[in-house]
């Protein structure tokens, strides 16, 4: 990777964004023999994946990190790049906090009162059945799309959830998957997301689900390896794209320090960021509406570092879900050899928005207090602490991914993927399988590259 000195360049294809989607697209294009340039606003590759050093050559993943079963695209890419995965630590009992009480349980569902537990099971089966009726390539064509897209998940819960326990568990599932509150999300979007993963259990589970495995050396290595394979001069860092002039003849992509002319462009950044680029001629109103309405989730990913994972000695897995918060979900995020010990906690939705206004030291105190509550006094005194407020990131504006509020799928969803002239769209938000996940990002890049190759012949 180099920061080129030229003020202008030409290529067959220009890719905007050097995250997983953009680099996967560029890799596929290079493999097919196309000349490609990738423009990245940040001073690094990886997008919403980022490795954070914690000493002794070890890292923690401060962005997206997990892969799981059925995520064939990203798991295949990991293998192709010579990387390995290791299982998330799940051995031991988990903690569930509600109403000031800490309960311990094994498996995926907390031990709560039988009536509430039975309702949770019934609701999960019902949501899976509803999701099965949503075509992932066109959610707006679901038989009940208009009805489901006219309400929030919160309003659906109000009508269909009877026990407080079930309501609390469903809310934790929602903020844990989308980093948004139930009131923020269209019911249709929730159902689409479940369908794109296969089931709500695949979305929420560790063992056997989306949180099953991690990448040895950190998930950013996937992007770093792809960028290395592309070779010098292909990826231009610190090059935020400001405008795209497009016609049937090609595109001219203008950044702060470089202008690239090409036959085709792949815009591989979240819709909310793609909407901040100036297009000439202007994009259709339905596409503008999509960019304006598809918000990013709100999350602060926090990690406390300890000399050893002492909770394992007490028979605890490190996994926690808390109704009380502000840390709502936590995991053991230690390196493969278990040293040092690392506890991961998420501040999500409303809690994240409140925490982003605080200093890192203040967030450290908040997270340490939560961990002390969950795991005892030793957890309240980490030797190090790292976090990332993704909503404050200029070139992310939130994580984990974009989500649709009521009305957006039925009004604007059809504009999400189709090319507009010589501009193609990629990114985790455009995926039909594992939307919003690293797997979805990789598959979207491959799909956009195939579109371009078909167009340029």
Where are these regions (language model features)?
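A short alpha-helix-loop-beta-strand transition element characteristic
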Residues: 75-96, 164-171, 310-318, 322, ...
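Conserved beta-strand-loop-beta-strand element in the redox core of flavoprotein oxidoreductases
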Residues: 245-260
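Dinucleotide-binding Rossmann-like beta1-alpha1 core, especially the glycine-rich loop
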Residues: 58-130
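Active-site/ligand-binding neighborhood in enzyme catalytic cores
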Residues: 135-239, 247-248, 268, 278, ...
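Glycine-rich FAD pyrophosphate-binding loop
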Residues: 30-55
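Flavin (primarily FAD) binding-site architecture
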Residues: 267-285
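Conserved flavin/dinucleotide-binding core of flavoenzymes
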Residues: 2-8, 12, 23-24, 32, ...
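Short hydrophobic core segments
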Residues: 14-16, 39, 241, 259-272, ...
């Amino acid at each position: 990777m180099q920061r080129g000195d030229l003020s202008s360049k030409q290529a067959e294809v220009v890719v905007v964004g050097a995250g997983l989607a953009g680099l996967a697209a560029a890799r596929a294009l290079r493999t097919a023999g196309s000349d490609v340039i990738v423009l990245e606003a940040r001073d690094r590759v990886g997008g919403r994946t980022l490795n954070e050093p914690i000493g002794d050559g070890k890292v923690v993943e401060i962005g997206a990190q997990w892969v799981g079963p059925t995520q064939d695209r990203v798991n295949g890419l990991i293998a192709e790049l010579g990387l390995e995965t290791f299982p998330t630590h799940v051995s031991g009992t988990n903690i569930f906090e509600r109403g000031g009480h800490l309960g311990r349980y094994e498996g995926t569902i907390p031990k709560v009162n039988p009536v509430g537990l039975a309702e949770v099971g019934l609701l999960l089966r019902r949501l899976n059945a509803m999701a099965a009726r949503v075509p992932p390539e066109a959610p707006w064509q679901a038989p009940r799309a208009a009805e489901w897209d006219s309400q929030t998940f919160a309003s659906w819960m109000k009508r269909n959830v009877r026990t407080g326990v079930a309501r609390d568990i469903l809310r934790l599932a929602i903020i844990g998957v989308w980093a948004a509150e139930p009131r923020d999300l269209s019911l249709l979007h929730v159902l689409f997301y479940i369908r794109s993963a296969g089931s709500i259990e695949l979305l929420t589970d560790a063992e056997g689900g989306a949180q099953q495995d991690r990448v040895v050396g950190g998930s950013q290595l996937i992007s770093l390896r792809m960028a290395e394979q592309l070779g010098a001069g292909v990826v231009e860092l610190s090059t935020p794209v400001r405008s795209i002039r497009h016609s049937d003849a090609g595109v001219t992509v203008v950044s702060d320090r470089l202008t690239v002319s090409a036959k085709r462009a792949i815009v591989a950044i979240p819709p909310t960021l793609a909407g901040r680029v100036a297009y000439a001629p202007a994009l259709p109103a339905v596409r503008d509406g999509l960019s304006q309405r598809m918000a990013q989730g709100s999350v602060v990913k926090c990690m406390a570092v300890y000399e050893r994972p002492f909770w394992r000695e007490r028979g605890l897995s490190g996994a926690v879900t808390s109704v009380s918060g502000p840390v709502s979900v936590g995991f053991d995020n230690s390196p493969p050899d278990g040293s040092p010990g690392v506890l991961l906690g998420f501040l999500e939705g409303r809690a994240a928005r409140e925490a982003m206004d605080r200093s890192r030291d203040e967030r450290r105190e908040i997270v340490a207090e939560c961990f002390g509550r969950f795991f005892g006094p030793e957890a309240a005194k980490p030797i190090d602490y790292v976090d990332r407020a993704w909503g404050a990131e200029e070139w992310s504006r939130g994580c984990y991914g974009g989500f649709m509020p009521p009305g957006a799928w039925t009004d604007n969803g059809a504009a999400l993927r189709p090319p507009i002239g010589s501009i193609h769209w990629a990114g985790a938000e455009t995926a039909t399988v594992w939307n919003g996940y690293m797997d979805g990002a990789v598959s979207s890049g491959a799909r956009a590259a195939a579109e371009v190759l078909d167009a340029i012949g």
